[in-house]
């Protein structure tokens, strides 16, 4: 079979990236819109704690997927993926008109509509890791990196949209008596939360359309079979086959020779290698990086950044979200296949993470507060920390690709388990024991 054209390959990478964009865009969008919705919802700034619990409950979606695989074995991931996408689109579309509706629960008003729809979206997003990733086992490893690039966009684009909206803008006017800062003045957003959720719905519709386009291209994609017993499609030229074989030979989870030559057979007879030392280490590494980037560090981001000002906080959020796509681009060009190298990068990421955790513990008066150097250091630390850990996660998942569908399914589970453990570990110190102290706007607690 002739090698696919450059245009078709570029289109496929684009569709895979847009497909990955829909994985966590809904929940990420809710998080970045919290500063707007808390003004009108009865929970106020306790809403993030409620939302953390709701997102954790979203892991119940994994049980639904497990039940589906038991009742419909061999049906693949297409149906669960489409269900996830429909739930995401419908959930965000309903948020637009209903997010501000409240109802009495146990004698107190609560955001019943907002939290219920957030639970639906959390279940869809949590389920995406164990449905989207196994689907990509039908494609060569470079497309997996495009998927993680899109997953990074699922965090970046809602952040950019929130910045355009003008979330969190305030001014500290001087008090007329003693010249100190008076009460903060909040600027109104450029458009309401309903418009934000409609824009988020449009992003998810685009992602769902990209998946449909991917299915239409599937018979022409390299290394993809249209059916379990159908003919296998070759990568193309002998040179491409040799290059793919060299790449697969470097993987710690080795595939059969037929896959290394550029074909994807039905079941993977070497899936047991997932339980080798290499496979277990890579899965543990993915769980650890997910715990840090999806659970531990997000819980303390406001404590580490807000003492340096709203600008530092917004720069850390947006540029930190951009670090994920940047790491994916880097992995496309330079992929670390050495376990020792991945360990070294993880230690480097832990160094940045330890600095950020120290800033959060020392809040509201961390070192270099009120200086430009402090702002630069905290923003740079967030960007480098997330970039390093994102690269490690992409590299580990690319190496796990050699184990086929079972390995990518296990990778998705590792991501979810790590994220859940990280969030669960940080909930008591942040929401129950209040170990971290926040800094109030327009108040200087560090003065003489």
Curated annotation (Swiss-Prot):
Membrane topology: Multi-pass membrane protein
Keyword Nucleotide-binding part of the UniProt annotation: no
GO cellular component, one term: plasma membrane
Compartments where found: Cell membrane
InterPro entries: Riboflavin_transptr
Residues carrying covalently attached carbohydrate according to the record: 178
Biased composition (Acidic residues): 240-250
Impact upon substituting residue 70 to R: Riboflavin transport is unaffected
Catalyses which reaction(s): riboflavin(in) = riboflavin(out)
Transmembrane segments: 14-34, 47-67, 79-99, 124-144, 147-167, 191-211, 280-300, 315-335, 342-362, 369-389, 407-427
Keywords on record: Cell membrane, Glycoprotein, Host cell receptor for virus entry, Membrane, Receptor, Transmembrane, Transmembrane helix, Transport
Chain spans, region Disordered: 225-267
Location, primary (coarse class): membrane
GO molecular function: riboflavin transmembrane transporter activity; virus receptor activity
Notes on how activity is controlled: The activity is strongly inhibited by riboflavin analogs, such as lumiflavin. Weakly inhibited by flavin adenine dinucleotide (FAD).
Tissues in which the protein is found: Widely expressed. Highly expressed in the testis, placenta and small intestine. Expressed at lower level in other tissues.
GO biological process per UniProt: riboflavin metabolic process; riboflavin transport
Effect of residue 296 to M: Riboflavin transport is unaffected
Pathology linked to this chain's protein: Riboflavin deficiency: A disorder caused by a primary defect in riboflavin metabolism, or by dietary riboflavin deficiency. Riboflavin deficiency during pregnancy results in hypoglycemia, metabolic acidosis, dicarboxylic aciduria and elevated plasma acylcarnitine levels in the newborn. Treatment with oral riboflavin results in complete resolution of the clinical and biochemical findings.
Similarity annotation: Belongs to the riboflavin transporter family.
Protein role: Plasma membrane transporter mediating the uptake by cells of the water soluble vitamin B2/riboflavin that plays a key role in biochemical oxidation-reduction reactions of the carbohydrate, lipid, and amino acid metabolism. Humans are unable to synthesize vitamin B2/riboflavin and must obtain it via intestinal absorption.
Protein name stated in the entry: Solute carrier family 52, riboflavin transporter, member 1
Gene that encodes it: SLC52A1
